[in-house]
Amino acid sequence: MKIYLDNCSFNRPFDDQASMRIKLETDAKLYIQEQVKQHVLHLTWSYMLEYENSMNPYKNKRERIAAWKVLTVQTAYETPEIVAHAKTFQTHGAHKKDAIHLACAVALQCDYFLTTDKSLCNKRRFFRPLQVMNPVEFVTDVLEGRP
């Protein structure tokens, strides 16, 4: 199963864990990472992840996130098709960077796009064929097979 984690998901473990929602999303993201390490899930990467991570002012976070690139099965680089698809996603309310992430996931033929961004999850019906999910939903509904 091929997945795309957006920048919000990669950064979730570094957020303040006082909120139960953030703690649950962190635990789910860490579980997903373990599934990647065990080759149960196939992680993808993109030029937008590379760019956003390079802009992170915290060297430790930047390096820890960048280390995941070696475990990826594919990387998406900018193409006219990705740019065009991103523009379509923007017409449905995705911000520019989010739209590029979504378009990269489509180009990589990912089964799931995982994000902790509530706004993207609330607009998921506009981003088909991608299945946009929060990491907690993905773990409970997909990996553990709960309806």
Would you name each region that the model predicts?
Residues 2, 16-26, 91-92, 106-147:
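Acidic, PIN/NYN-like endoribonuclease modules and their adjacent C-terminal/linker elements
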Residues 48-52, 69-91:
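Acidic catalytic patch
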